[in-house]
């Protein structure tokens, strides 16, 4: 047995038992004390490098904080908060239509910042008062391109507070691949240039909130990390809590000090299209309809269906959202809801010309830099709105249509100094999109007939 032990050697460095002080045996392998010391040195070096990187990141963050920053805007007071009618008037300058939604938003935003002014830093609220004012987050329901994000952004600009947009489809429950809900607060903090106090008075718009609905009303057996799991993770943030926000993102930089943000003063606005929610409401109201629509009336019926859907959504109840896939706890933290109308052709025409930053005005400004005066005939504006309405993507389709229309013009005009004026006609719009847009199915049926 002693003769057999004399041939033992380290499985890593190959040294025999006589050449080392200690040889530790494992299942089929051996390691000497020298290799163990070497492994410990490697681990210590990696730990030191990781801590040094973390200290460097903290130093960069502290240098950014030490850099001169814009002075924080003063907290709102009851005298400086715009009244609901003033808020709606400002929204009218930027957003066409949606009067009911504007009214709901104006009152909700006014009450929210009036609550912040009432609480203040603790000195504004009377000590004898036992009344605590809780915030009311907002839910916007409307089809794509109807102005949900623009409304929230315009509100933030008017109130002069930081504004951040988050996409609910990228969020996952903590511990899974995707973004943590704390990253939403990190974006708001970045918009506030690292000013925590200013960020705590900001507005966060969470888009595509309907995409985190669970697949069925009944609790799932398997874990839904991007649906119900995200709703559960958002509960405390929506209600109000002190969240720990990693300034460099929590997953790639574990060695960093977190910044604490109180979300009780942040206004959350959630928006989504909620496709199929009108069917849920109609089933509750017992208004199901089954039938076939002739091809020649399909376009008119489609427009009528959009209008009917918006009217049905006005009968929305919390139980309908539960059946759609939102958990009751989540719905309870968004008590204010507003339904946005789908945009018709008249609204799209107004969007092209009326707002302060209307698309027609934007392209006129672009060409004026080349000393060219651009004009849109009313018939051309109507044709652009008609094409955008046919695409069913709301106001977002308008820019794509005009970009296609203006491509050759913006390519040639800078090199043609003799051109001083250009007029967009209806014929030019039809010619531009006649070969690029598929005809409506009803027209195909008429041609085949």
Swiss-Prot record:
<dbReference type="GO" id="GO:0046983">
    <property type="term" value="F:protein dimerization activity"/>
</dbReference>
<feature type="binding site">
    <location>
        <position position="10"/>
    </location>
    <ligand>
        <name>Zn(2+)</name>
    </ligand>
</feature>
<dbReference type="InterPro" id="IPR038366">
    <property type="entry name" value="Znf_CppX_C4_sf"/>
</dbReference>
<dbReference type="InterPro" id="IPR027417">
    <property type="entry name" value="P-loop_NTPase"/>
</dbReference>
<dbReference type="InterPro" id="IPR003593">
    <property type="entry name" value="AAA+_ATPase"/>
</dbReference>
<dbReference type="GO" id="GO:0009376">
    <property type="term" value="C:HslUV protease complex"/>
</dbReference>
<keyword id="KW-0143">Chaperone</keyword>
<dbReference type="GO" id="GO:0051301">
    <property type="term" value="P:cell division"/>
</dbReference>
<dbReference type="Pfam" id="PF10431">
    <property type="entry name" value="ClpB_D2-small"/>
</dbReference>
<comment type="similarity">
    <text>Belongs to the ClpX chaperone family.</text>
</comment>
<keyword id="KW-0067">ATP-binding</keyword>
<comment type="subunit">
    <text>Component of the ClpX-ClpP complex. Forms a hexameric ring that, in the presence of ATP, binds to fourteen ClpP subunits assembled into a disk-like structure with a central cavity, resembling the structure of eukaryotic proteasomes.</text>
</comment>
<comment type="function">
    <text>ATP-dependent specificity component of the Clp protease. It directs the protease to specific substrates. Can perform chaperone functions in the absence of ClpP.</text>
</comment>
<feature type="binding site">
    <location>
        <position position="13"/>
    </location>
    <ligand>
        <name>Zn(2+)</name>
    </ligand>
</feature>
<feature type="domain" description="ClpX-type ZB">
    <location>
        <begin position="1"/>
        <end position="51"/>
    </location>
</feature>
<feature type="binding site">
    <location>
        <begin position="143"/>
        <end position="150"/>
    </location>
    <ligand>
        <name>ATP</name>
    </ligand>
</feature>
<dbReference type="GO" id="GO:0008270">
    <property type="term" value="F:zinc ion binding"/>
</dbReference>
<dbReference type="InterPro" id="IPR050052">
    <property type="entry name" value="ATP-dep_Clp_protease_ClpX"/>
</dbReference>
<dbReference type="InterPro" id="IPR019489">
    <property type="entry name" value="Clp_ATPase_C"/>
</dbReference>
<keyword id="KW-0479">Metal-binding</keyword>
<feature type="binding site">
    <location>
        <position position="35"/>
    </location>
    <ligand>
        <name>Zn(2+)</name>
    </ligand>
</feature>
<dbReference type="InterPro" id="IPR010603">
    <property type="entry name" value="Znf_CppX_C4"/>
</dbReference>
<dbReference type="InterPro" id="IPR003959">
    <property type="entry name" value="ATPase_AAA_core"/>
</dbReference>
<dbReference type="GO" id="GO:0016887">
    <property type="term" value="F:ATP hydrolysis activity"/>
</dbReference>
<dbReference type="GO" id="GO:0051603">
    <property type="term" value="P:proteolysis involved in protein catabolic process"/>
</dbReference>
<keyword id="KW-0862">Zinc</keyword>
<feature type="binding site">
    <location>
        <position position="32"/>
    </location>
    <ligand>
        <name>Zn(2+)</name>
    </ligand>
</feature>
<dbReference type="InterPro" id="IPR004487">
    <property type="entry name" value="Clp_protease_ATP-bd_su_ClpX"/>
</dbReference>
<dbReference type="InterPro" id="IPR046425">
    <property type="entry name" value="ClpX_bact"/>
</dbReference>
<keyword id="KW-0547">Nucleotide-binding</keyword>
<dbReference type="GO" id="GO:0140662">
    <property type="term" value="F:ATP-dependent protein folding chaperone"/>
</dbReference>
<dbReference type="GO" id="GO:0005524">
    <property type="term" value="F:ATP binding"/>
</dbReference>
<dbReference type="GO" id="GO:0051082">
    <property type="term" value="F:unfolded protein binding"/>
</dbReference>
<feature type="region of interest" description="Disordered">
    <location>
        <begin position="53"/>
        <end position="79"/>
    </location>
</feature>
<protein>
    <recommendedName>
        <fullName>ATP-dependent Clp protease ATP-binding subunit ClpX</fullName>
    </recommendedName>
</protein>
<dbReference type="Pfam" id="PF06689">
    <property type="entry name" value="zf-C4_ClpX"/>
</dbReference>
<dbReference type="Pfam" id="PF07724">
    <property type="entry name" value="AAA_2"/>
</dbReference>
